[in-house]
């Protein structure tokens, strides 16, 4: 059995870039693992949102990659974008710390909404290393094979694009730096924004560094102000 590419619900440019991944044996194993997980309980995000990051940020539009670990595992939180939650859901602690850093870095008022779709639509790929999770079980799908897929995403961006900003927060994300050609891109590393890191994330100023780099390379900077999105 193989994967039918026509049935993979992912944006066309990504489907072309990642075609070899979708047709590989490990991706078929991911599919079977997901089918079995769905038989035994709830899986987040909903299947139509698993590739949300790719559908909101086509390959040719990627300017920035923010790498997370796995989706939120509570009902109604995961939406297929790292660190993001839907409108109306309480802002999680790590995202609240990201907002505080943006305020300190750029003077932007902290929004009361956790939906990061506005960033994604500007070219910020909000990628989780693992794209699914079982209900109330953090990292429960970490052995499904998703990391092979997300590593391939990072490698393809690194090899086929130039001038991308990679934000790698925490030890897990920082370990992915070896997948990136640092002479072609900007790799920014810091502690994780989680409160468990005891504030070590603060002062990294990644958001201004990112925009300065994009401008230097002739690209439009990211508008990090989510208030411009939530007011629309």
Swiss-Prot record:
Annotated catalytic residues: 70 (proton acceptor)
GO MF terms held by the record: uracil DNA N-glycosylase activity
Signal peptide: none
Protein purpose: Excises uracil residues from the DNA which can arise as a result of misincorporation of dUMP residues by DNA polymerase or due to deamination of cytosine.
Localisation per UniProt entry: Cytoplasm
Keyword Iron: no
InterPro entries, A to Z: UDG_fam1, Ura-DNA_Glyclase_AS, Uracil-DNA_glycosylase-like, Uracil-DNA_glycosylase-like_sf
Alphabetized HAMAP family for the sequence: UDG (MF_00148)
Gene name as annotated: ung
Annotated PANTHER family: URACIL-DNA GLYCOSYLASE
Keyword annotations: Cytoplasm, DNA damage, DNA repair, Hydrolase
The name this protein goes by in its record: Uracil-DNA glycosylase
A Pfam family it matches: UDG
Catalytic activity: Hydrolyzes single-stranded DNA or mismatched double-stranded DNA and polynucleotides, releasing free uracil
Annotated family: Belongs to the uracil-DNA glycosylase (UDG) superfamily. UNG family.
EC number(s) per entry: 3.2.2.27
Gene3D superfamilies: Uracil-DNA glycosylase-like domain
SMART domains per UniProt: UDG (SM00986), UreE_C (SM00987)
Superkingdom of this protein's organism: Bacteria
Major location category of this protein: cytoplasm
One GO BP annotation of this record: base-excision repair, AP site formation via deaminated base removal
Database matches in PROSITE patterns: U_DNA_GLYCOSYLASE (PS00130)
GO cellular component entries: cytoplasm
């Amino acid at each position: 059995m193989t994967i039918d590419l026509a049935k993979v619900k992912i944006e066309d440019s990504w489907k072309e870039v990642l075609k070899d991944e979708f047709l590989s044996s490990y991706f078929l194993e991911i599919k079977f693992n997901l089918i079995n997980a769905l038989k035994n309980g709830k899986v987040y995000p909903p299947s139509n949102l698993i590739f949300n990051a790719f559908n909101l940020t086509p390959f040719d539009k990627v300017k920035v990659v923010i790498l997370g670990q796995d989706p939120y595992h509570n009902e109604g939180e995961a939406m297929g974008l790292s660190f993001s939650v839907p409108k109306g859901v309480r802002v999680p602690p790590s995202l609240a710390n990201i907002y505080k850093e943006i305020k300190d870095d750029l003077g932007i008022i902290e929004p009361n909404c956790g939906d990061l779709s506005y960033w994604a639509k500007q070219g910020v790929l909000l990628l989780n290393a693992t794209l699914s999770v079982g209900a109330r079980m953090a990292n429960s799908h970490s052995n499904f094979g998703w990391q092979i897929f997300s590593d391939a995403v990072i490698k393809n961006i690194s090899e086929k694009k130039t001038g991308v900003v990679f934000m790698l927060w925490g030890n897990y994300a920082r370990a992915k730096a070896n997948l990136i050609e640092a002479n072609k891109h900007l790799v920014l590393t810091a502690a994780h924004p989680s409160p468990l890191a005891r504030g070590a994330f603060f002062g990294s100023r990644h958001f201004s560094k990112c925009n300065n780099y994009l401008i230097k390379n002739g690209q439009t900077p990211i508008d990090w102000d989510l208030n411009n999105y939530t007011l629309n």
